[in-house]
């Protein structure tokens, strides 16, 4: 295996591990409060599916020289499974049913891909089938921050887009993109090239808006207006009281 190929793969493992562990802060809060509050559980089973498909694609009988792809995505699959189970434990009944349904579909999709690739396909056909499946869900995973980027542009604030998370999205996408180029593997290079581009856009947005306080939310503006009205009422009451004393 090419030394540069290995170096970028190891670096990709490190940055991807950071991204997988990033939601642990959210889950500490969920466990502490014994509630999922307003957090969405959808990203975790979807990321789990991406990890399972990518880990499967990296296995030697599917694609050669991609063991590092399997190791990090196998680790990610374990981490995401833990997240899903915690979310299911603390979620309200309606949300629990929805997330369990998505989780079941994820396992069904992965099982279908694995069984078809094992018993119906061989050689390049197997690699093509598994690679396409992994690529589609990798792009979907990388595209998930688009809503946050839109929020940043709308509010002119980076409050909901932490710098280090954006940085590691960029580093992870870039390292695996180069890894795919060196290994001449389009199924690794293409989705991670997309991730590299999105990470770059996130960093550009961060540096454009990092000095802004941003537009306040409607609720915050409403609260401030309410406080101001109460202050005005107090001042008016004081004035009226003084007038009564003078009379």
From Swiss-Prot:
The phenotype of cells or organisms lacking this gene is:
Impaired glucose transport activity.
What GO CC annotations are associated with the protein?
endoplasmic reticulum; endoplasmic reticulum membrane; plasma membrane
Q: MtN3/slv domain spans which residues? A: 7-94, 130-213
Which region ranges are annotated with the description Disordered?
221-247
Induction statement:
Slightly induced by the powdery mildew fungus G.cichoracearum.
Q: Where are the transmembrane segments?
A: 7-27, 42-62, 72-92, 99-119, 128-148, 163-183, 188-208
Tissues expressing the protein: Mainly expressed in flowers.
Q: What is its main location?
A: membrane
Does the keyword Transmembrane belong to this entry? yes
- Stretches of the chain found on the membrane's Cytoplasmic side: 28-41, 93-98, 149-162, 209-247
According to the UniProt record, activity depends on pH as follows: Optimum pH is 8.5 for uptake.
State where composition is biased (Basic and acidic residues).
Answer: 221-236
Supply the Pfam families for this chain: MtN3_slv
Q: Establish whether keyword Transmembrane helix is in the entry.
A: yes
Cross-referenced Gene3D superfamilies:
1.20.1280.290
Bias kind Polar residues: ranges: 237-247
Q: Which cellular compartments is it found in?
A: Cell membrane; Endoplasmic reticulum membrane
What membrane topology is annotated for this entry?
Multi-pass membrane protein
Recorded GO MF terms: sugar transmembrane transporter activity
Give a short account of what the protein does.
Answer: Mediates both low-affinity uptake and efflux of sugar across the plasma membrane. Can transport glucose, and, to a lower extent, mannose, fructose and galactose.
How does the record describe its quaternary structure? Forms homooligomers and heterooligomers with SWEET9, SWEET11, SWEET13, SWEET15, SWEET16 and SWEET17.
PANTHER family, per this entry? BIDIRECTIONAL SUGAR TRANSPORTER SWEET1 (PTHR10791:SF44), RAG1-ACTIVATING PROTEIN 1 (PTHR10791)
- Entry similarity comment: Belongs to the SWEET sugar transporter family.
Q: What is this protein called?
A: Bidirectional sugar transporter SWEET1
């Amino acid at each position: 295996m090419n030394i540069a190929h290995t170096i970028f793969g190891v670096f990709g493992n490190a940055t991807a591990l950071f991204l997988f562990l990033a939601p642990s802060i959210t889950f500490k809060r969920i466990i502490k409060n014994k509630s999922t509050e307003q957090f969405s559980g959808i990203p975790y089973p979807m990321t789990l599916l991406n990890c399972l498909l990518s880990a499967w694609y990296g296995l030697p009988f599917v694609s050669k020289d991609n063991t590092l792809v399997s190791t990090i995505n196998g680790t990610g699959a374990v981490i995401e499974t833990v997240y899903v189970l915690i979310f299911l434990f603390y979620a309200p009944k309606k949300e629990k049913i929805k997330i369990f349904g998505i989780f079941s579909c994820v396992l069904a999709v992965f099982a279908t891909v694995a069984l078809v690739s094992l018993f119906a396909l061989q050689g390049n056909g197997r690699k093509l089938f598994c690679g396409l499946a992994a690529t589609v869900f990798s792009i979907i995973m990388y595209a998930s921050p688009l809503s946050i980027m839109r929020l940043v542009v709308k509010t002119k604030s980076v409050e909901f887009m932490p710098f280090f998370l954006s940085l590691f999205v960029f580093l992870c996408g870039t390292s695996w993109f180069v890894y795919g180029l060196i290994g001449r593997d389009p199924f690794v290079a293409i989705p991670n090239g997309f991730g590299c581009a999105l990470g770059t856009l996130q960093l550009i947005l961060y540096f454009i808006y990092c000095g802004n306080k941003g537009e306040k939310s409607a609720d915050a503006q409403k609260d401030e207006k309410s406080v101001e009205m109460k202050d005005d009422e107090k001042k008016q009451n004081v004035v009226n009281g003084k007038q009564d004393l003078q009379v």
